[in-house]
């Protein structure tokens, strides 16, 4: 579908709109009731690696707008699902989501109290607000991943899993090295729903050693 350029609409916004209109995952999300196309990234990764199977406690870091949380609620009925995001997330049945900056000092304590036990899975689709400078964006997002990993190491039950978004840029191998010390299996994957022109990838760490 082609999009006509409005006089005051930027070329980049036209490209974004055209991409959205032509994206089968956007159409599928609208049709199936998911809040974002990102839901399919989690679905695809879980279908291949099964990290949500049997999960009873799951944490979703960077939950807005709620696509990943929706998937977890569907695949893990009855599980304790807690999420956090700086942006407010509309209620999702079966999940408790707090509006708070995950990087805030009190966030970790709040999440641990809400979990009321060790987590089976910690998910992080967090990414820093983009600046337009690729290396800066990479470093800022990797700082979020490092904090998410530190949290996961504290709350995961033995044999638990950690799944996080990373941006390619040179330093992601360092965090993979750290993960390999704590998990039996660590993979670097790009699900089909991740746009080919995006630098994002996901790390899937399974078999937490405790």
For each feature predicted by the language model, list its residue ranges.
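A short glycine-rich, Lys/Arg-flanked "PGG" loop and its adjoining helix->strand segment in the class I
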Residues: 142-158
